Amino acid sequence: MTTLGHNYDNSLVSNAFGFLRLPLEFNPYATDADWVITGIPFDMATSGRAGCRHGPAAIRQVSTNLAWEGCRWPWDFDVRKRLKVVDCGDLVYEFGDAQDFCDKLQDHAERLLAAGKRMLSFGGDHFVTLPLLCAHAKHFGKMALVHFDAHTDTYANGSKFDHGSMFYHAPNEGLISPAHSVQIGIRTEFERDNGFTVLDAGQVNDRSVDDILAQVKQIVGNLPVYLTFDIDCLDPSAAPGTGTPVIGGLTSDRALKLVRGLQPLNIVGMDIVEVAPAYDQAQITALVAATLALEMLYIQGAKRGDD
């Protein structure tokens, strides 16, 4: 992990503070944390505009604007009193060595899960989800995937390290069950017979939130769920700072309502990926990513009952 053997964060792309102004915890495996935030500054699998290695820092920086509220609207409790959350800084790996990255991220995730922690991760390009799925499946078994994106990322293009191929590899490796997985906000071409339920952006924008959530819950069933949110699921008007923006996406309001409605699911791991601050305007992409991350923590805190 970032700081093993050190008392500082030695990532070249991180901040000096954690998400929501949390202090950085340099030995997350030994803490009493419920959820551990990990920054994953990796964008070597990007096919379009690079730069999302700076996503974790951008999300953390703008999250300072969210830290002042005790109870985040519309919730009636302070998530920091319901959950013990720590930020362990950024994963450090040999830059230019994608295999070293995969090995170190999977090892870090396996150690956290073995210690009883859950993970909220900030990418980085979407390829980072694959080693995270490997670690989570080793711990929880085959999972359902709830995937927000403009792209299905199920493309069999023969590339080992590609941010468009993770969900082609994951079913083949037995990590997730496509029959119990749903992809939300899709608006690019994809193979129609890959086994996933695809809710394209047109129907997600036109149908009611309650109707969509009912379908998601039916598809997922009782399986453990991994939740992954590619920020390009949102329309570029809400999230311009990403590598492969696609017009016609979700609004931030609809995305927040959908994430909020996932509270009943057995979510065992979560990530937000593809924030590329070089293309952002007034930090709005980083802000919506940080807000979605906070919402993800709130749906976990809501399971804990009263303070």
From Swiss-Prot:
Gene3D superfamilies: Ureohydrolase domain
One Pfam family recorded for the sequence: Arginase
Keyword entries, A-Z: Hydrolase, Manganese, Metal-binding, Polyamine biosynthesis, Putrescine biosynthesis, Spermidine biosynthesis
UniProt cofactor(s): Mn(2+)
GO biological process, one term: spermidine biosynthetic process
Top-level taxon in the UniProt lineage: Bacteria
InterPro entries documented for this protein: Agmatinase, Agmatinase-rel, Ureohydrolase, Ureohydrolase_dom_sf, Ureohydrolase_Mn_BS
HAMAP family given in the database record: SpeB (MF_01418)
This enzyme's EC code(s): 3.5.3.11
Catalytic activity annotation: agmatine + H2O = urea + putrescine
Pathway stated in the Swiss-Prot or TrEMBL entry: Amine and polyamine biosynthesis; putrescine biosynthesis via agmatine pathway; putrescine from agmatine: step 1/1
Binding locations of Mn(2+): 126, 149, 151, 153, 230, 232
Disulfide bonds: none
One annotated GO molecular function: agmatinase activity
EC category name: hydrolase
Free-text function comment from the UniProt entry: Catalyzes the formation of putrescine from agmatine.
Family: Belongs to the arginase family. Agmatinase subfamily.
Gene: speB
CDD domains: Agmatinase_PAH
Name of the protein described by the UniProt record: Agmatinase
Keyword Cytoplasm annotated: no
Family annotation (NCBIfam families): agmatinase (TIGR01230), PRK02190.1 (NF002564)
